Amino acid sequence: MDYDLVMEDEFDALCLDVRRDHDSASKTKYPAKLHARKVVKELGVDDGLIYLPGQPDISLENSDQPRLFRQRRYFFYITGADFEDCAATYEVKHDKLTLWVPYVEPRQVLWFGSKPSAAECKRRYDVDEVRYTTQLSSFLRRFAAQPEPPVVYILHPDQAPDLGHGSQSQLRLDSSLLLPAMDRARVVKSDYEVAMVRRANDISSAAHRRVAERILRLTNEREIEAIIQAVCIANGSRSQAYPIIAGSGANGATLHYGANNAPLGGKQCVVIDAGCEWNCYASDITRTLPLSGSWTPKAAAIHAIVQRMQQECIAKVGPGTAWRDIHLHAASLGMEGLLGLGILKGRREDVARAGTVAAFFPHGLGHHVGLEVHDVSGTLALSAAEGHGTQLDFGKRAMVTPSMLADMTRSASSPDAAGVQERKTQLLLPNMIVTVEPGIYFCREYLEGYFRSDPAHADFIDWDLLEEYYDVGGVRIEDCILVTEDGYENLTVAPKGDELLDVINKGEK
């Protein structure tokens, strides 16, 4: 991979030109038709109409200022169109995908600029036809007027199409099948989508590198956030996939910390979780940096445990692997590490049976990445905690309680239970993109609020020794991993390990 590094004096940000062979994908048409056909395959029908409205232009409440636009991801998936007030229809029987775009009056151009024309949309997106939304109602009325109109598939009842002219809808609507079908289609990425996530990771990795180069000169968490945004914007990405997390000291123990306004002085570490979007596709990267340029003994010990957790878990990624098993391996390594430090104590078997390590590693190992940073998981969850009615869903960050972890461990070791769980648990497939993000956290409120008074766990924790680790805060390391035919590829190129320490201490070139 080659980089061209350019200083942009206007905002003192690193401009990154990443040259890869796969970047040509971003210059081709968005594969809308491919994605629509994937959806129909999962839908399992040979006739009908898929109707998806895009995000309308909406003003802030009691204001004439617009809300920050974010395209509806299901609509985007089968069109690639990233502007307001559009819609999409796909006629299943005729394999015809139509993008409906708004007509922009000249006076609107004066105030707000133009939007892509119908001809431009045809060049950008692999759709069969581009028409104006002013014609959509008449199209739908003709569809409804058929002697036996096919079913119209919509995501939600409140997205039923408007036939206009006060007509009562004669459409046969189904809002139960499309969403799960689209989730199953989205969970395995097309090559185009992989290229988009790769590009987002390249830019975000450059942002993390730039923070590492400057970290010894920074004084406040907000400076970290500013650098990340500047680097991403300078490289063409104006949108972060999620709010930037820059938690120093005890703030690093808050999983979704967002204030980003605390001074860095006197802290051991800072957890930086940040990833931008490229063409609506997300990245998700976390690095933990020593603020002095070297690890304190306590932070070094925790970082070593988390680093091993991530390295070994990434090595286990491959087609046919159950995510539950990788998560359990991470939890086992975390438990062994904390037992070695004396933070956890007691017989290994007893600690494992209780699941007490979840007090320190309280979230799932990872999630899908795509059009959402916590992307859809299809129909099956990554892991299922039997008896809890709660799933460790790839698409949403979920709390992993000790009892859930204990149930997962028991099901994995019991042949009968494992068979049931295997049918409930998602196996990794080629072209899935997942994060591997183990972490160990010392959140005083969480630990003392739930575990100190719980006899099932209190005796397995050395509370006096734990006091010496609260100032570490937390350590998390996260990369985006592409599942390949024969294993995996790490899409994240942000420095970590010894390379990260070298970057920190060498500073800016």
Curated annotation (Swiss-Prot):
Record keywords, A-Z: Aminopeptidase, Hydrolase, Manganese, Metal-binding, Metalloprotease, Protease
UniProt cofactor note: Binds 2 manganese ions per subunit.
SMART domains per UniProt: AMP_N
KW Protease (keyword) present: yes
Alphabetical GO biological process terms: proteolysis
InterPro entries assigned: Aminopep_P_N, Creatin/AminoP/Spt16_N, Creatinase/aminopeptidase-like, Pept_M24, Peptidase_M24B_aminopep-P_CS, X-Pro_dipept-like
SUPFAM superfamilies: Creatinase/aminopeptidase, Creatinase/prolidase N-terminal domain
Name of the featured protein: Probable Xaa-Pro aminopeptidase MAC_04092
Origin species: Metarhizium acridum (strain CQMa 102)
